Amino acid sequence: MPLGLGRRKKAPPLVENEEAEPSRSGLGVGEPGPLGGSAAGESQMGLPPPPAALRPRLVFHTQLAHGSPTGRIEGFTNVKELYGKIAEAFRLPAAEVMFCTLNTHKVDMDKLLGGQIGLEDFIFAHVKGQRKEVEVFKSEEALGLTITDNGAGYAFIKRIKEGSVIDHIQLISVGDMIEAINGQSLLGCRHYEVARLLKELPRGRTFTLKLTEPRKAFDMISQRSAGGHPGSGPQLGTGRGTLRLRSRGPATVEDLPSAFEEKAIEKVDDLLESYMGIRDTELAATMVELGKDKRNPDELAEALDERLGDFAFPDEFVFDVWGAIGDAKVGRY
């Protein structure tokens, strides 16, 4: 963003007396540049103008989920930068931020901040709380865990299947960050790597999970939830547009996804959980984006290998993704 004279004075990062869910009708994409007149224009001759939407000037309101004043954050293009801005506003180490939810302070995995933020969304940051170590006997092949990650190096539990091995261990809850398995640190690992490690643990053996739960306010200390059913709540922002965060490249302001895209993303996310034990709406959205204009499964497989080769998706999974996108296109929900 260009700097210049005559800009409005920047608001302080913390706003003590603001309501928790304020109206922000003044949010917009960018501001007029401070330079004007022919002299300024002549001095810039020959230089290409900066891309207008490279870093859209959007201000979001945020609180710590366990309770805090309201903060204002702006100027981030990915999740890692977002966590840094939140940490700066609340004078915390960035490593303390575990994940964020949109428009609720509760550990609600259906409101988890992923790759998109509605322009009117209110961000609640969940920070590290109590650490715990739990021994688990793997009596069945499937533990009943669905893993996701925050895009910044922390993998955590998004869902616990009812009646599963993990469901019977009350110390383990949705929202717990998985720090280590049998002493092996998982900090910096992606969700699919953690899910694979859990799957490869031998049946009939005991293993140790080192976990960190989100810090809780008094009104949040209650019986743990197994997480909502996929698609049981709004997955994307409710504002007039959405800020799309990418792990590579700049953030962009986009229209809300179409009904086809929203349903396709939901179906692909379900397939990720079924095949790989993870949920990741940003990954699902990327796969839908790659596949919506492809003519056959082979073209989709080629696009996925080129962009997402690290995941090594099996052929049957790619075929099911192709089918899910096709079903959503023709309205077979």
From Swiss-Prot:
Question: What InterPro entries does the record tag this protein with?
Answer: GH2_GIPC, GIPC1-3_GH1, GIPC1/2/3, PDZ, PDZ_sf
What residues bear Phosphoserine in this entry? 68, 222, 225, 232, 247
Q: Which stretches does UniProt call biased (Basic residues)? A: 1-11
A Pfam family assignment: PDZ
**Tissue localization of expression:** Widely expressed.
Please list where the region (Disordered) is annotated.
1-53, 223-244
Q: Which GO terms describe its molecular function?
A: actin binding; GTPase activator activity; identical protein binding; myosin binding; signaling receptor binding
- Membrane-spanning segments: none
Subcellular locations according to the entry? Cytoplasm; Membrane
Query: A Gene Ontology CC term for this entry?
Result: membrane
Biased amino acid composition, Gly residues? 27-39, 228-240
Residue positions, PTM Phosphothreonine: 242
Which residue numbers delimit the PDZ domain? 133-213
What binding partners and quaternary form does the record give? Interacts with GLUT1 (C-terminus), ACTN1, KIF1B, MYO6 and PLEKHG5. Interacts with RGS19 C-terminus. Interacts with SDC4/syndecan-4 and SEMA4C/semaphorin-4C.
Q: Which family does it belong to?
A: Belongs to the GIPC family.
- This protein is called what? PDZ domain-containing protein GIPC1
> Which organism encodes this protein?
Mus musculus
Lineage of producing organism: Eukaryota, Metazoa, Chordata, Craniata, Vertebrata
